[in-house]
Amino acid sequence: MEFHHLVALAVALIVSFFATPIVRKLAIKVGAVSIPKDSRRVHKRPMPLLGGLAIIAGFLLAVIYTFATRDFNDFIKFIAEPKTIGIIFGSLIIIGLGVYDDIKPLRARIKFPIQLIAAIIVVATGTKITTLSKPFLDTVAMHPSMMYFLGDVLAFAISVFWIVGLTNAINLIDGLDGLAAGVSGIAAISLFIVSVIRGQDDIAIVAATLIGAIAGFLPYNFNPAKIFMGDTGATFLGFILAILSVEGTMKSVTVLSMAIPILVLGLPIFDTMFAIIRRLLHGKPIAQADRGHLHHRLLDMGLSHRMAVAILYVVSAALGLVSIALVDKGLLPSIILIIIIVVFGLGGARNLKEITITPEDENCKCQRTDEEEKDIENENQHEGIQNGEHEGIQNGELNNAQLEAAIGDKENQEKLNEEN
């Protein structure tokens, strides 16, 4: 890691860290709050959304500062390029959609076409796969001109599909405190290392900036969370990670180039694939939320909130490690590493099955740590939320004063912790 990478990371981290409390207050003021209305939602009390705005602020300011101070003239030229303009416009669409959705939830059939437009803008202006190679086209006998045309069409379609798919994949795993942000951060670390190995300095700077922006937000998002990043953050992270992977590893679609980003982002990708298959098999709309995601299943096994997140961090990091080995060491060492990880993973799963406890009571106290019990007791005591003093919690109808009382500020929470 070079000095300018550290600068990019540090600036993003500082801005994101100090912006998050401000965004939290803003979310409460505008009513961007997640209300725990069903069993699918793991949190027990109303939680401010819009945390993604702090991540975005740290990311954008750090990117501008790092590139502008490195060479201002090149930075101006870079901003004026069609590709950059397309990324900016596409990102603004995703951010605007996310903010609106956090304040006034939208249906998937409304969000998807808008996300599709954002992805098409990005791809049409140059952020796309440029070459399709073996075994994708060479096995088909056709005229060279038709091959080039089909290659361009497929490359465009694959690029759009990848960006839209990953934008939603990160959002779908955003079900536990710190999960989506942490997994995105691990993916950004993997992409950073891959880009450094390949000598792609611009990609490395952007990845380092994303790492810093996420790191600044995570202290507020770890369990017990004080704020969620919401659709604003989850869709933005997925969108940017998709663009980074296209620019960094997917310019030419070979088996190797496709394997790297799929491994780096394997957890959200495979969780999304299984969610789609699961819903289709049960005859449900693929956009209908359920409690069948991997993180839900870990909780249902009896794991604590933090343990479930930690396990998924390890899985994501292991996949990222394989992608790095694939770039740096080649195919054979990567296969050996995969075998080692699978063996340890199976052993860990066996031990996990033995130590997890099936909850015997409805409160599931047997699976919580003392610290988690204290957090839950604090939540139950605070403003009488669990006793129904705020009647609007179940139907989501709360005014700003009620939201502020239900959520509580940091100082009141600390006082409760001291009393306990």
Language model: regions and residue ranges:
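"…together with the soluble PPM/PP2C metallo-phosphatase catalytic core" -> "…together
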Residues: M1-F270
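Membrane-interface capping segments at transmembrane-helix boundaries
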Residues: I22-K25, G348-E362
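Cytosolic, membrane-interface loops and tails of multi-pass inner-membrane proteins
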Residues: I22-M47, F274-R306
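Generic hydrophobic alpha-helical scaffold/packing signal
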Residues: G216, A242, V264-L267, F274, ...
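Alpha-helical transmembrane segments of integral membrane proteins
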Residues: D300-A318, I324-V327
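Long, low-complexity, intrinsically disordered cytosolic termini of multi-pass membrane proteins
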Residues: H305, I357-N420
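Alpha-helical membrane-embedded segments
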Residues: I340-F344
